[in-house]
Each structure stands twice: as C-alpha cells, then as structure tokens.
Amino acid sequence: MTTMTTAAAKAAEPTRTTAIASLHLLAELEGHSSRAWHLAWNPRMPILASCSGDKDVRLHAYSFVSTTSAQGASTCKHPSFNLREVIPTGHQRTVRQVAWSPDGKILATASFDSTVGIWERIQDIDGSSELQGNTDASGPVVLSNGGAHVDEPEWDCVGTLEGHESECKSVAFSYTGGVLASCSRDKSVWIWEVQPDAEFECLSVLMEHSQDVKVVAWHPNDEVLASASYDDAIKLYIDDPSDDWFCYTTLTGHESTVWSISFSPCGNYLASASDDLTVRIWRRLDADQCEAHGLRPEGKMAGRRGEKWIAVNILNGYHDRTVYSVSWGVDKTSTRPGNLGRIASGGGDGRICVYEVTASDDEKSLQPKVELIAKMERAHASADVNCVSWAPESLNARGGTTAKIEQLTDEGETLNKGGQHASHELMSDMLASAGDDGSVKVWTLASSAYAATSK
C-alpha cells in the first residue's frame, strides 16, 4: 500500500497569480432533458459525445471556420459545433459515462442499468466507407422533438456487456484498444478483451475496493489500469501474463470519495479529484528513482522492474464543494521549460479551475510546480459541473489511418506551421464541460487564439 507523505505534498500547493483569467465560452450545446454526466472527444473524428440521465448520447460535430479581420485579413480558424446525431441508447436507466476506442470506431456506454453498450459506426460495420468525420454544418440535419439529428442513424448497437450486479459507473479503453475496463456500484472492476466483430470476453473480475467504484482510467502508454472509489482509495492494476490481473498498489490520502482520476499525457503523473475538496497529484517513480530515494518498488515481476507512486501535490482551497472531475491535457502553447500540460477541475460549486503544471527547477525535487491560471465561476449557472474534458492534441490514429486535417477546415486547406498542422496546436486549447443543467459547454483560455477570433 502506498501511503502519502503529507509533509512533502502540502508544501507544493499551487501558487496564485495576481490576476486570474476567466475562461472564454466557445459553444453552448443544449438538448439533454436531464443532467449531463460525462463527455468524450473522439480521438479520430471531430466529434464530442455527451451522455445524460435522459438515457441518450448526443454526438456534436465540430469544424474550424475562418474569420476575417476588419482589414480583410484572414485570421485564425475557430471551432464551430453542430448536433450530428442523437443516439437513443435503449438503456433502461441513466447513461453515466461514454468512452471511445483509440481508433474512434467503437463507442462504449456505461449505464445505471448495470450494462455496458457497445456501438459501432454503421458504415464501418458493412465496410462501405473509410472512417471519416462529417463536419458539414449545412448537412442533412432536421429538427425533431426539439432537437436536430441526421436523417439516418450513423451508429448502431452491436453488443451489450452484462455481468455487473449494480449500477455501472465508468468504462474506458486501454491505449491499444485491445482491452476495455468497467466498474460498478457492486465494488467490482471488470476487464474485457476486445475481439473482432464486436466480441468481448471477460478476462478478469477484480474485487479490490470495499465500496462503490466510481471511475476507471487507463495509463496513456502502458497497460496499467487505475480505479477510484467511495472507499477514498485509488488502486492500480497490471496483468501478470502467467496468472491474472492484480492490484499492485493502493494510493491513500484522500479523506473522502475519489470521483475522478486522469493520467498526465507523459504518464508519469496521476491527478485525482475528491469529495474532500482537493485535487491531488501523484508521481510515478521507476526502479532507479526508487533506489535513489530509498523506496521499495511495487509491481515487480518477470520483465518488469516495478515502480512506486507517491503523492507530491495537494491542490487545496480552489473548490468550495466536491470536486467531481479532473482532466489532464496537453499544453502546446507553453514555452516554459519542463511543461507537463494543464489540469482542469470542476465541481459541485459550479466552478472550473485550470492549472499549469511544470517540472521543478530543482532536479532533486519530485514535486512539479502548479499554478492556477484560469477560473470560471458559475460555469453552468447554479448547477454542478459533473465533467471537464480537454480536447485531444490532434485527430491521429495509433498505427492506422490519420484523419486528415482537411476534414477539420471549412476550406479544405492544410495549415502548415513549423512542420505541424496549426490546428493541432489549438485543438488542445478546447475544454468541454457537462453540468446538472443538462448543457454541454466548450471553453478556451482567454489567452488562446480561439478567444480572439470566435464571435
């Protein structure tokens, strides 16, 4: 069990700048008839999925639209969102969470009816089309029952995963897409193997938590699974090829329910959000670092030297009520050395906070520097913020076809900047939030080029 060293962690609370910027609203996406619970950006297509207590999943497509200055010069492209499709999932109760596979071809839905729904794009099922994102805002959209949708469904349910004995709270694909994890109020974490033709086989059922399991999340580049629970703990799991999946460490220190967890893009840190009003940052030390600091590595087995996760920061005093969600995204605009990205947090106080994270100037220090750089009060009026989620850095497939940037622009042009697509830098500036008011909102930092060009 990994026990937090509070003296070290408390010393690293984030600094407050003299003037904290607010967030700039890019889009407000309404339509859910009940609270919006969760969001997921498709990693391959320009689509943002949201789920709700109304049992529907709404797919919002986005494109990048050019704006022109008063002098007639073309300026930065900003995102424009439109409702692409409403999926009536058929779940009997709330859809609590949604997740995309890394190739963007599978959507999973976790429901309070204890099941996980598996959805595939119809054109991919029949093989009639290469995976592409249709972002044409003037496409075949009609109004029906107060909400627009495409004429024909684009996504179809191809399977239902059963086994949980109570509400299913979370679902997540591994970075390879070969494994799916789900968790439930029944205190269990299930691990499923993703097979061809939407076949899923249960590989393991883990009963490590003593209470309701709130969320599961995969490491961005390793087969490491994390889960967080009503029992205030975070557990990490790996697969022993000669045996089974097992919990190799438990992270303790939170004083109440852990609602959300998010790995850093580099994979060496983990952020967690809790009912104790804090966000905590944990750092992974490899075997050599453990030896240098006199710590014993955990998770050792054949071919694996082990590691240890320790608490290094407590972000306290930034939320007045439960912190329900945390998301760690890429920061492509930072010029600071040791850039580790940005953390966003949202909670029951209706506030969204954004923190910049950088490595310490002191090479001997294990604590990153954390600075509050933006804050949005009443992000969803008086409603709770249930989820915050940074957009992906770019729409690239792992080991597969790349979604061309032309699909994201209104002019079909490729925007080159320093050998990269300019929009790749800016995509990660988008932050989506979901609230108890049923709405989904898309924000950006006031310093972002989007804020200057959006209407």
UniProtKB/Swiss-Prot annotation:
CDD domains: WD40
Keyword Repeat assigned: yes
WD repeats: 31-70, 90-129, 163-202, 208-247, 253-292, 318-365, 380-453
Protein name, as recorded: Probable cytosolic iron-sulfur protein assembly protein 1
Keyword annotations of the record: Repeat, WD repeat
Gene Ontology CC, one term: cytosolic [4Fe-4S] assembly targeting complex
InterPro entries associated with the record: CIAO1/Cia1 (IPR028608), G-protein_beta_WD-40_rep (IPR020472), WD40/YVTN_repeat-like_dom_sf (IPR015943), WD40_repeat_CS (IPR019775), WD40_repeat_dom_sf (IPR036322), WD40_rpt (IPR001680)
Family under the similarity heading: Belongs to the WD repeat CIA1 family.
Organism: Mycosarcoma maydis
Function in brief: Essential component of the cytosolic iron-sulfur (Fe/S) protein assembly machinery. Required for the maturation of extramitochondrial Fe/S proteins.
PROSITE patterns the record matches: WD_REPEATS_1 (PS00678), WD_REPEATS_2 (PS50082), WD_REPEATS_REGION (PS50294)
GO process annotations (BP): iron-sulfur cluster assembly
